[in-house]
Amino acid sequence: MKKLLFAIPLVVPFYSHSAETVESCLAKPHTENSFTNVWKDDKTLDRYANYEGCLWNATGVVVCTGDETQCYGTWVPIGLAIPENEGGGSEGGGSEGGGSEGGGTKPPEYGDTPIPGYTYINPLDGTYPPGTEQNPANPNPSLEESQPLNTFMFQNNRFRNRQGALTVYTGTVTQGTDPVKTYYQYTPVSSKAMYDAYWNGKFRDCAFHSGFNEDPFVCEYQGQSSDLPQPPVNAGGGSGGGSGGGSEGGGSEGGGSEGGGSEGGGSGGGSGSGDFDYEKMANANKGAMTENADENALQSDAKGKLDSVATDYGAAIDGFIGDVSGLANGNGATGDFAGSNSQMAQVGDGDNSPLMNNFRQYLPSLPQSVECRPFVFSAGKPYEFSIDCDKINLFRGVFAFLLYVATFMYVFSTFANILRNKES
């Protein structure tokens, strides 16, 4: 009896902390909060958590961490808390946990109707206003040599963010004749990029966009960056398992690293294997590094700079020629020669004295013709005599003719000797 009385204080607090009833739980207000130890129902995909003796269901925009055990959302009380071993299988353990095969459910992004518990934004629903980066009414498609890596599937369409716009895969295009090359065409559907939190090309629980005029539907990962890394290319499927493993063991779409159930306590470890496509990755890097390059703009910019340099050099040369011409013609020292004014002022007329004047003194004096005047000998003497101009002009004409003949003969004989020497 004493032992029983001693045990009563230990048993009463154990039951008193969970004195909630269904009515008291349902009367609790909704709360927007982040709960831990969250599990997901394998069939409805709803998320549940025990808190303060009540069972809560996550509604609205549900955002979870990478291991999906902590989620943020609008939590609604639906009844009394349930033991952890009776959960939906995500907590591992109980006999009613997730199956032992760990095959995983079909990724919801391939369906046309969103599955409850997931948040979607349809890239084709027309909620994207026109912008300046791209004009969806007059799209400018981009052609890729190979299917790019950074794409994601949604409602049977493949999308890609590129150059500040959301683009959608619209088929293949062939160009050329020898050889014929096939390109993958992506056409803009929005003037804004769509930022998505996904792994292995799949949406997880949150897709959001930003920068719109309307009130955007934005959600972020709590405790984890929304920019998740890309998995290896062509990763193989994981081999999930474990007796208490969650429903998302290996993943039917090649989850690779999520084997064994990321939400459960199962002991099975997933494994993924695949060949890394180096060529595809190289093409993706090439496209990422060159997608913003505008060849025409670069050529135009280079041509403009070269034309400017050529114009400056041409103007400098023209100015120098003008300065030299002015200095030679006595127009003053200007431009490049303006600094020599003080020195030139000490010579002649300074910079107003043509340079040619300084060279004329070194030129030989050539005879100049004058008006004919009679030659008078011994003027005023008894034996004075004179030669009239008509006789002088006659002599000049005869002498000039003889000089012409002699010059012609000299030139003719010179060329004749050259020709004779060439023939011999």
Swiss-Prot record:
This is Attachment protein G3P. Belongs to the inovirus G3P protein family. Residues 1-18 form the signal peptide. It comes from the Viruses. It comes from Enterobacteria phage M13 (Bacteriophage M13). Coiled coil: none annotated. Residues 253-262 are annotated as: Not essential for gene 3 function. Residues 132-147 have a biased composition (Polar residues). Residues 142-228 are annotated as: N2. The gene is III. One of its GO terms (biological process) is viral extrusion. Residues 86-105, 235-273 have a biased composition (Gly residues).
